From Swiss-Prot:
Residues of the signal peptide: 1-48
Full protein name: C4b-binding protein alpha chain
Disulfide bond entries: C50-C95, C80-C107, C112-C153, C139-C169, C174-C217, C203-C234, C239-C281, C267-C294, C299-C350, C334-C362, C367-C412, C402-C425, C429-C471, C457-C483, C487-C528, C514-C541
GO terms of biological process kind: complement activation, classical pathway; innate immune response; negative regulation of complement activation, classical pathway; T cell mediated immunity
Subunit architecture: Disulfide-linked complex of alpha and beta chains.
Subcellular location: Secreted
Record function comment: Controls the classical pathway of complement activation. It binds as a cofactor to C3b/C4b inactivator (C3bINA), which then hydrolyzes the complement fragment C4b. It also accelerates the degradation of the C4bC2a complex (C3 convertase) by dissociating the complement fragment C2a. Alpha chain binds C4b. It also interacts with serum amyloid P component.
Positions of the Sushi domain: 49-109, 110-171, 172-236, 237-296, 297-364, 365-427, 428-485, 486-543
Keyword terms: Complement pathway, Disulfide bond, Glycoprotein, Immunity, Innate immunity, Repeat, Secreted, Signal, Sushi
GO CC aspect terms: extracellular space; plasma membrane
């Protein structure tokens, strides 16, 4: 196929005409469309074609389309559909040769006018006021809508208008409130009541109101005024006061109750409430919820403890009729002449199984039978009672005689012991033993049983053993004590003791150890002896001269153990100098003493009688 030559075209910016070089017969009213058409025509000779153009919601072709294929560059002019207006001069579609029609939206929806404000209501705009849009109308609380609840922007002639006019919102109205039997309301004789109005009902005497006393005019479904809630009714309601065993009323005292009156119950001490404590009188003359019950929640009465009595609690005496809470503790004590059988608290506790805990029994107090050992006899026995299995019980009194010359009395106490002591006759004892470095004192001049001797030691001695001895059937008891010597702590220069104490007791032994460089002169072990001295005598700690050291002795000892001869020489010179100083000081003291004696010789005593 032979391609045609494309002629040159010149467009005038200010004119509406375009000329071909070989003809002046072409006249173009729309230069832009002409230019686009020309370019599309030129492209069509090179590229492909397009199918039927797409359907547009906002526009349709000006000319009827009879073809199904269009060459590249074909331009189709469109016009806006009803409800739309043109927004661009490029109201056409162009075939781009790739089977696509290219265009930019050139029509927009027309807009309806602002519907205005709705008195006592609201205009709800879903999107905007454009063609096809919807608006809704609603009224404020207490108002009803008269008219359409919505409106649409629709076509009319060549323009767009709202389908429905602006409605009205008028205040809701209710019919007069209903009348009720055996009651009335406080409203007037008005033909109607506006939204928010209320009336209050009251019942005739002896009638109870079932329901709410006041009702109000409300709006139902946003369309009609109704009374809410429903009017009450008046009915004779009588509830009889229920009896709750082991319970009591704390609020709402009757005995006759009407509708919705209430009672509050509580249980007596030791009982547990089962059910609701608050009940109401209902319209059917019954109580709702049902009256509660009081269940036992403690220990009823007191346990029987023989030979015991209960102690007072909160200044009150316990009784068999009382109920005691779980965990409640009661104390008891045994009768006179009785005591707890075992050690432990004399209490009982109310347990969770509503039973009392086990208790310690009270056992009769018995005193032991006197053992006079054939040295005496009981002369009198006075007892408070004979109903006992004991020979001697609490309160018994006896008199007994020992050695046919000593008389004693004894009382059986509540603790099962004799007072002042257990009756006993023992043989007489000889004089208490004599001990070295000590002496004894006796309580009585007769050394009879139970008499005592008290020992004490001389100064510088300490008692070892029992201080007091008693006269028993086997003699003086316990063993005779001893008086042991006390030795003072030895003072040893440069030494230390194995046991450091202020005083040491005969025959205590200590060991002496000397400090480093010193050795023990004497016995290392010394013993505290009976004469309060150390035996052997206390040792000394003396200096031990190391091997290879120089020694100088002149009235005292000086030892220098030095490594170099120069140091040894210096030490000896220092020692020599110290000796010279000591000699000078001694001579000075001697001279001063001589002068003092000379002055004393020259002192005379002058006597002047005047």
């Amino acid at each position: 196929m032979k391609h045609q030559r494309v002629p040159v075209m010149i467009l005038h910016s200010k004119g509406t005409m375009a000329s071909w070089p070989f003809s002046r017969l072409w006249s173009i009213s729309d230069p832009i469309l002409f230019q686009v058409t020309l370019v599309a025509t030129l492209l069509a000779t090179v590229l492909g074609s397009c199918g039927i153009p797409p359907y547009l919601d906002f526009a349709f072709p000006i000319n009827e389309l009879n073809e199904t294929r269009f060459e590249t560059g074909t331009t189709l002019r469109y016009t806006c559909r009803p409800g739309y207006r043109i927004s661009s001069r490029k109201n056409f579609l162009i075939c781009d040769g790739t089977d696509n029609w290219k265009y930019k939206e050139f029509c927009v929806k027309k807009r309806c006018e602002n519907p205005g404000e709705l008195l006592n209501g609201q205009v709800i705009v879903k999107t905007d006021y454009s063609f096809g849009s919807e608006i809704e109308f609603s009224c404020s609380e207490g108002y009803v809508l008269i008219g359409s609840a919505n409106s649409y922007c629709q076509l009319q002639d060549k323009g767009v208008v709202w389908s429905d006019p602006l409605p009205q919102c008028i205040i809701a109205k209710c019919e007069p409130p209903p009348t009720i039997s055996n009651g009335r309301h406080n409203g007037g004789d008005e033909d109607f009541y506006t939204y928010g109005s209320s009336v209050t009902y009251s019942c005739d005497r002896d009638f109870s109101m079932l329901g709410k006393a006041s009702i109000s005019c409300r709006v139902e479904n946003k369309t009609i005024g109704v009374w809410s809630p429903s009017p009450p009714s008046c009915k004779k309601v009588i509830c009889v006061q229920p009896v709750v065993k082991d319970g009591k009323i704390t609020s709402g005292f009757g005995p006759i109750y009407t509708y919705q009156q209430s009672i509050v119950y509580a249980c007596n001490k030791g009982f547990r409430l089962e059910g609701d404590s608050l009940i109401h009188c209902e319209a059917d003359n019954s109580w709702n919820p049902p009256p509660p019950t009081c269940e036992l929640n403690g220990c009823l009465g007191l346990p029987h403890i023989p030979h015991a009595l209960w102690e007072r609690y909160d200044h009150q005496t316990q009784t068999e009729q009382q109920v005691y809470d779980i965990g409640f503790v009661l104390s008891y004590k045994c009768h006179f002449g009785y005591k707890p059988e075992t050690d432990g608290p004399t209490t009982v506790t109310c347990q969770s199984n509503l039973e009392w805990s086990p208790y310690i029994e009270c056992k009769e107090v018995c005193c032991p039978e006197p053992n006079l050992n054939n040295y005496g006899s009981i002369t009198l026995h006075r007892r408070p009672s004979t109903s006992t299995h004991c020979t001697y019980i609490s309160g018994d009194k006896i008199s007994y005689e020992c050695h046919s010359k000593y008389m004693f009395d004894a009382l059986c106490t509540k603790h099962g012991t004799w007072s002042p002591r257990t009756p006993e006759c023992r043989p007489d004892c000889k004089s208490p033993p004599v001990i070295a470095h000590g002496q004894h004192k006796v309580v009585s001049k007769f050394f009879t049983f139970d008499h005592q001797a008290v020992y004490e030691c001389d100064k510088g001695y300490i008692l070892v053993g029992a201080k007091e001895l008693s006269c028993t059937s086997s003699g003086w008891s316990p063993a005779v004590p001893q008086c042991k010597a006390l030795c003072l702590k030895p003072e040893i220069e440069y030494g230390r003791l194995s046991v450091e104490k202020v005083r040491y007791v005969e025959p205590e032994i200590i060991t002496i150890q000397c400090e480093s460089g010193y050795s023990v002169v004497g016995s290392e072990n010394i013993t505290c002896s009976e004469d309060r001295t150390w035996y052997p005598e206390v040792p000394k700690c003396e200096w031990e001269y190391p091997e290879g050291c120089e020694q100088v002795v002149t009235g005292r000892k000086l030892l220098q153990c030095l490594s170099r001869p120069e140091e040894v020489k210096l030490a000896l010179e220092v020692y020599k100098l110290s000796l010279e100083i000591e000699i000078l000081q001694t001579n000075k003291l001697k001279k001063e003493a001589f002068l003092l004696r000379e002055r004393e010789k020259n002192v005379t005593c002058d006597f002047n009688p005047e």
